[in-house]
Each structure stands twice: as structure tokens, then as C-alpha cells.
From Swiss-Prot:
Protein name: O-methyltransferase 3
Keyword flag Transmembrane: no
Gene transcribed to yield this protein: omt3
Gene3D superfamilies named among the record's database cross-references: Vaccinia Virus protein VP39
Family listed: Belongs to the methyltransferase superfamily. METL family.
Amino acid sequence: MNNKTSNGDITNDEPTVGSKRSWTDVNYKFCEDKEKQVVEEIQTETSWADVDWDSVRESIAKSITEKETDIIGEEDKIHHEDNAMDYWDKFYKKNQNKFFKDRTYLHLEFPELNPLKITRDETFIFFEDDDAAAEGAENGGGGGGSDNLYQDKDDLEKQEKEREKKMANLLSKNVDIKELKNRWVKDIQELTNDESKKLTVLEIGCGTGATVYPLLKLNPEKYFYVFDFSPHAVNLVKSNSLYNEAKLNAFVCDIATEQIPTSIVKDNSIDMMLMIFVLSAISRDKMHAVANSLFKSLKPGGVLYIRDYGLYDMTQLRFISKKGKKIDENFYLRADGTRTYFFTTQVLSEIFEAAGFKTLVSKYDTRELRNRKRMISMYRVWVRGKFMKPLDNENTENNSKILSIYNDPINNNNNNNNNNNNNNNNTTTTTSTTTTN
């Protein structure tokens, strides 16, 4: 029978093993012979599982990307560089705040953003009153579609099953939901009143607020600055009923072409920074200037948290099948005129270390995504990083309070993995990580 792949192409005769339908690895679709390959030995049908991005699969992905030859012309490159803001502004005008789901999963990845110590199972309860339950915890990606709101019936059914599963997990542990919520109310009050834990957070590329508003609820003791180079996106943040200047300041800034205004954010004043699927939208040759600008605003001891697209992600392989989409090495043009870059951990670390940051964590997060209806297996690859501005040993009062507040989880967390990454990472070697998402 005819079947559609996730990319919309029609294929004939679903492969079978014996009398059973079998899973197909969608990456093989891009190979020269165009034949779909059966994924062997899939024991379960668990979607969004951590996987080992093994050398065989990486070799296939690398051989595919090396065959790319069509690069858009210089005139088109200049046009999309000069009009990058306009294309994103059009994107937000078209989609408003309805494209991306709230990212209610970042506290699970970065414990410094989880002062209430909310677990994965508790997350959907914490956010359920906001109609933003824990879908994000399963769908962990960001810009470009992995956490967008356009979902089919199968997606919604899966999410409902996940909610039921998590509720069952809590009940099996004899968790009293009412008592849990009362505890959060008490903890929030204590955090808000504790002057020693008041930190400042800056989000670079805030979009419509899909990151900042969940984090505001989770981090009542922190003050947030957020900016975007799309005026329409910033207006959407400000029009949100939760916008409160006592807790949040949103403004327009193009980090790729200008410094962060010191009239709003003073140098050496920020404790934490967030770049969630933002750096990839900037031209590679401007990333170093961006890192330098962020370094100036961050306090000594402050930390920059990054999540973005990794090399050989499923979406990169999709670009390869489309002519006229490659701008430069690992840099592509979307249909709507926006752009995206795919990182290695080595490149990510080099960018920020050159600006003076210390790499604390730089690793891959690889996931297998299975579509049961179409029986296809796809792979997402992200990079996740933590970069610290070195401490000021001469004047310790200038240093951020992050390390003391959180008992230095940044340096203790995944320190061995970070050392391994620094020693072993290159553009042709990726590693699987077990991360919350």
C-alpha cells in the first residue's frame, strides 16, 4: 500500500518482517538508492527515547551532507542577512503566539532554574492551570517545529496518555496533590521574600514568551530581562496578561548587529543568560561578536545556558533533499525566509571560549522519535551547553551568587562528561546523553 513519510513523500509497500509491519528509518530516505531500510531489533514502541547516535548512523548522515553541492547565490545570502529581522517579524505577525508551545521543560535540564525542585511527573500539575501541561517535557526542541502547536489527533491522544501516566505515577507514590500545591504556595512565598536568592536573568531571543513565562512561574525570586530583534514578538510578550514590569522587562535589540543597551542592562549585572534555539538563527561569522556582547553583560561567575540544533539532526537531513536551501556549511534557509545553523559541540565551545567563557557543559542530546501510524523512526539531535564567565578573584563582591545558592551544581553536574567532550568532540563524532527533556 502507499504510505507517506514524515517529509510528505509517497512510498510503496511498507517493509515487513514475517507477517508484521516493521519500522523504517527515515534517514535512509536521503541515500542515493532511495530505498527505505528496515530498522532491526526495535524491542518497544516508546517514542522520544534517548538513543545512541552510533558511528554507523553518523557515517550515513555524514556521507549525505558531503554530497551537497548547491549553495544559494551571494546576492541571496546578502538579501537574507540584511532582512533577517523582517523575515522573523513576518513569522510572528503570521503565527502570533500560537506556533510554539510553552517550554515547560527547561527546569528539568537546568536545575538552577528549578528552585522549587519540581519533578518531571509533577511538572504537568504545576502548569495545568495555565493550559501548558508537560508536553514540552516530552517534545523538548524549540524553534523550527519541534515544539510547535500544530498537532494531529495522534499527538493529542499521546499527550493525554502521558498526563494519565504521570498522574498514575504520582498516585502510586501516595502523593497528595492538594498537599503538593500547598507546599508550592509556601515555597514560592519564601523564595519571594528571600533577598539573598534574588537573581537577574536575561533571555536572548525571547520570541513570544514561550520560555520566559513558564520560568517566571517557576522562579518568582528572579527578575527577567528579555529581548528579541522582532518588534512584533516583543509586543506579543508585553501584551500577555502575565506581563508585569516589576518582574519582567522586554525590549527590542538585534544582538547580531548591536550591543545590549547599557541603559537597560548594565555591564556585569546578569546572573543567568538563556539562548534557547536562538544562536542558530544568526550567521556563523557574527556568532563571535554575539558571544563578546553577552560576556560584557554577565557577572563574573554568571552562567549562560544554551540549547540548540545539533549536527545531523533530522531537520538538517530534510534540508538536503531540497534544492537551493543551503547558505553555507551547516547553515540553511527555511521556506519562510528564516535561517538555521546546526552545531557541533566543538564549534559551540570554541565560540564562547574565544570570548572568555569557561565551558562547563557542552554535549549532545540525541533522541529517537517514532511515528507509530506511519511506522517510521526519526532522529533529533540537539546541543546543550553551560558557559561561565570566570570569577573575579580580586573583588568577590562582583561575583554572581549562583554557585553559592545552588551549592555549585554547575561545576559538579556532568563534570566528567564535560571533560570527555572537551577531549573527544569533533565534527564527526557525536555521543548520546541521558538528559531530561
